[in-house]
């Protein structure tokens, strides 16, 4: 790239994009960038170069290795406990892999994204928080997608807020990328945010030269328990496989999901997923309606539709959670495990998970054995830091 500005320009732009309410004097103090006048000059240069618009963006022609190194420096400056929390999360992932026979690859990378505060019941502030998170996470997600030749993507408001803010006309090196949905859609509920097929379409449009995105619009997300129990011949699953796109993605063996380089997903916990109205998770409610009323209480939450059983369940209750997953028609636990095991290899980011709300701390800690990259809000990072590093962490 030509005319690379110094680190101070990037740092000033990063702080301003992360929290637009910060004054120039505050940025100078927090980032150790000098006086208000000095910060003003740095921000002016960042705007002139196009690195600071509505959100922080790296130069489009910055080499990937240089961008990753700079991203790391900026994040360590912005969130002071970043290195300690990342190390604690990695240790937690290793512990899970040792204690769970179905464990995947250890966690590799944490990104903490600036997000405005909000309070329960203030829906406007919550929308603003999700929007800011998505705007600030988009550049990080795009960097990982740049590396991958294929990407399976999930659903929801966090995914929506992020993929909508990825700048368009990104040009992948080599053959076009393949984007695919992680699952079909609820039969009885409208998608809230984006569906997996919507998200795949948005991503394909952002990367010039990608293959036409695969779609499962109109295809079911799961087999209801009441249907499954009477379907001795597997007709319901065969009906889902009538879709050519479904077969291309999920055929066993040989489906694209078996060798996907990246899974981009949110994480759902039972508490926040139970909300109704604008905050509802239609995929949760579809599952709750299709299964026994109390069975989801046996799980701590889900990652991309795969439910994770609570610790300490007896064999019977654990089997109930496994059966819920068996009736899921999207990516399976083994698909997440396979993707996470290969994560970190060249061109394979693995499982990249997004989460905003502090209430999701428990499911994040339980799902780490399937996650390679975790992108979270500052508020959730603070909650995880208190859990893993001690009660006095701020």
Which residue stretches match the model-derived regions?
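Short glycine-rich or small-residue beta-strand-to-loop segments that form or flank ligand, phosphate
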Residues: 27, 149-155, 180-185
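Residues in well-ordered beta-strands of folded domains
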Residues: 111, 180, 355
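Short, acidic/small-residue loops that bind anionic groups at enzyme active sites
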Residues: 161, 169-190
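Conserved phosphate- and dinucleotide-binding cores of soluble alpha/beta proteins
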Residues: 2-14, 18-28, 32-33, 37-103, ...
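Acidic/polar, low-complexity linker and loop regions
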Residues: 109-117, 183, 214, 340
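Nucleotide donor/acceptor-binding cores
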Residues: 148-149, 175-177, 349
């Amino acid at each position: 790239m030509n005319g690379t500005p110094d680190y101070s320009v990037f740092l000033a732009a990063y702080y301003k994009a992360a929290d637009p309410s910060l004054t120039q004097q505050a940025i100078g103090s927090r980032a150790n960038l000098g006086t208000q006048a000095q910060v003003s000059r740095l921000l002016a240069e960042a705007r002139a170069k196009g690195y600071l618009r509505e959100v922080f963006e790296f130069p489009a022609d910055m080499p990937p290795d240089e961008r990753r190194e700079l991203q790391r420096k900026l994040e360590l400056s912005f969130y002071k406990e970043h290195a300690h929390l990342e190390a604690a999360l990695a240790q937690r992932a290793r512990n899970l892999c040792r204690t769970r026979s179905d464990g995947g690859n250890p966690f590799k990378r944490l990104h903490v994204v600036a997000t405005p505060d909000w309070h329960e019941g203030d829906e406007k502030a919550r929308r603003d928080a999700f929007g800011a998170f998505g705007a600030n996470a988009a550049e990080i997600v795009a960097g990982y997608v740049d590396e991958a030749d294929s990407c399976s993507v999930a659903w929801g408001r966090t995914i929506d807020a992020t993929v909508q803010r990825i700048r368009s006309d990104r040009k992948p090196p080599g053959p076009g990328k393949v984007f695919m949905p992680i699952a079909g859609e609820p039969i009885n509920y409208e998608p809230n945010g984006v569906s997996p097929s919507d998200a795949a379409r948005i991503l394909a449009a952002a990367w010039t030269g990608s293959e036409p995105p695969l779609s499962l619009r109109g295809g079911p997300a799961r087999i209801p328990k009441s249907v499954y129990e009477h379907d001795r011949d597997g007709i319901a699953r065969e009906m889902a496989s009538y879709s050519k796109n479904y077969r291309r993605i999920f055929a066993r063996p040989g489906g694209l999901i078996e060798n996907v380089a990246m899974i981009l997903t949110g994480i759902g916990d039972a508490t926040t997923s139970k909300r109704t109205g604008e905050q509802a998770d239609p995929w949760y409610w579809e599952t709750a309606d299709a299964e026994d009323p109390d069975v989801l209480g046996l799980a701590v939450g889900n990652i991309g539709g795969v439910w994770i059983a609570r610790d300490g369940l007896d064999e019977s209750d654990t089997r109930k959670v496994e059966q819920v997953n068996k009736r899921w028609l999207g990516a399976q636990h083994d698909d997440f495990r396979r993707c996470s095991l290969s994560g970190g290899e060249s061109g394979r980011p693995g499982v990249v998970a997004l989460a905003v709300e502090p209430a999701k701390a428990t499911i994040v800690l339980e799902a780490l054995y399937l996650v390679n990259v975790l992108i979270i809000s500052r508020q959730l990072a603070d909650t995880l830091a208190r859990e893993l590093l001690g009660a006095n962490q701020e």
